[in-house]
């Protein structure tokens, strides 16, 4: 049997490079459990912090489970206060857009789960993920972890002729 991991007690670490408002602490659970097809991370948010900007995925499905606290979810229908035990699924595409923010006065702890895309980079074997950030008109391609403005798009033949 794989050694169990307690998601309530797993140690989380902050990102020293995170800008104000995105200083949540996290622990990636997938590697700790040896997972290959499902990703999972625990996030702990202080009041005023968000996990990441409003976004949606084009290559993976994400799930959110609230462990403690009352985070606020922004989705295409607006903002909603969540409670411990709430479980949601964000499908691929614009309908699955979301952002999780702690607007309460106490810490929030959540788990985010995601499928891992099967399409992989030939050289490294890394999965390819494509994330869209509607508020900032960006698209992110992982790897290599670059973000681009959608409005900077070029034609198919640009630079080829």
Model-predicted segments: where are they?
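A short, N-terminal "cap"/entry segment at the start of jelly-roll beta-barrel domains
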Residues: 1-37, 131-161
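Conserved short histidine dyad/triad with adjacent acidic residue
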Residues: 24-28, 41-57, 95
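Short, conserved beta-strand element in jelly-roll/cupin
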Residues: 42-46, 57-73, 113-117
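A generic structural motif
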Residues: 51, 61, 68-70, 77, ...
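Short beta-strand segments
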Residues: 52, 80, 129-131
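Short acidic-glycine-tyrosine-enriched beta hairpin
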Residues: 76-93
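Ligand-binding loop in jelly-roll beta-barrel domains
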Residues: 92-119
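Intrinsically disordered, low-complexity coil segments
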Residues: 115-130
């Amino acid at each position: 049997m794989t050694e169990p991991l307690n998601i309530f007690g797993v140690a989380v670490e902050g990102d020293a490079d995170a800008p104000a408002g995105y200083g949540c602490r996290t622990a990636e659970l997938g590697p700790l459990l040896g997972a290959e097809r499902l990703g999972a991370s625990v996030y702990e948010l202080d009041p005023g912090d968000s996990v990441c900007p409003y976004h949606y995925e084009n290559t993976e499905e994400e799930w959110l489970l609230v462990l403690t606290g009352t985070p606020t979810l922004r989705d295409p229908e607006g903002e909603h206060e969540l409670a411990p035990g709430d479980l949601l699924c964000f499908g691929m595409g614009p309908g699955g857009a979301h952002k999780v923010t702690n607007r309460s006065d106490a810490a929030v702890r959540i788990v985010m789960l995601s499928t891992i895309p099967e399409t992989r980079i030939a050289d490294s074997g890394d999965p390819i993920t494509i994330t869209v950030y509607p508020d900032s008109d960006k698209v992110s391609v992982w790897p290599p972890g670059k973000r681009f403005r959608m409005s900077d798009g070029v034609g198919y033949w640009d630079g080829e002729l």
